[in-house]
Amino acid sequence: MDTLSENVSADPEVMHGKPVIEGTRVPVEVVLNTLAEGVSIEEICKEYDLSEEQILSAVNFAADKVSKEEYRALEA
């Protein structure tokens, strides 16, 4: 298991190696998609038995990854 950031890890044996909330099988992707659907942090905590700190760690992990990417528009 690799710790990718605080509260986020990846293991090829867990969820096909996708980043998950450490100690769970909840992918960061699921947390982000659920937030994007307008579900509150409190509701996500209850649904997935997570803490607010874990949710915010997932958001920070994703923000860090996006900030390091370079995007270019494709020409038509």
What are these regions (language model features)?
Residues 27-30, 34-76:
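Long, charge-rich, low-complexity alpha-helical segments
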Residues 5-26, 72-75:
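Short, Lys/Arg-enriched anionic-surface-contact patches
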